[in-house]
């Protein structure tokens, strides 16, 4: 009887530790950070969208997404990057024309 209680206690502790490990691992899901910025020119016609990296990242970045699904990290302070973001915003959310 004592060994059955010990076995149940061990299984309970093992199950609890697996739950904690699984929950801790899930906190980083979906977080993408840039380590460096791309310095070259990016043709506008190859871009499908953009997003800003999480505030949890050490380096603030704008990430452009290409038609092939690639992510390109860019400096949000760069003038070309700002113009590209404005362009993408204008084609994604066109301003209604007055009649």
UniProtKB/Swiss-Prot annotation:
Its main location: secreted. It comes from Felis catus. InterPro entries: Chemokine_b/g/d, Chemokine_CC_CS, Chemokine_IL8-like_dom, Interleukin_8-like_sf. Disulfide bonds join 33-57, 34-73. Residues 1-23 form the signal peptide. Chemokine, which displays chemotactic activity for T lymphocytes, preferentially Th2 cells, but not monocytes or granulocytes. Therefore plays an important role in a wide range of inflammatory and immunological processes. Acts by binding to CCR4 at T-cell surface. Mediates GM-CSF/CSF2-driven pain and inflammation. In the brain, required to maintain the typical, highly branched morphology of hippocampal microglia under homeostatic conditions. This is C-C motif chemokine 17. It comes from the Eukaryota. It is found in: Secreted. GO terms for cellular component: extracellular space. Keywords: Chemotaxis, Cytokine, Disulfide bond, Inflammatory response, Secreted, Signal.
